């Protein structure tokens, strides 16, 4: 699936699972703010309800294997940030500013614009 197809898929399956440790965010909990802005929810496990698996550094291989067995789209953390404009184009972004953090502090990320 390309990013546009994944965005369409997330309109029906709004649960996302993150495995591993984010390199671009302070922690996996920072994904919660981002998911909220797109009407998505974090899954507690990989299941048939999961719409997307985001793979960060040092992921759990069994989560990747489970997602693959269930034909769940699997993308990297970098691809997630490339997917965000596709979600916005489908009207999934609620207009809420999305805070995200790195080791230098908290920044504002404006979807579709310059942060």
For the regions a language model picked out, list residue spans one by one.
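DNA strand-break repair and replication-stress modules
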Residues: 1-115
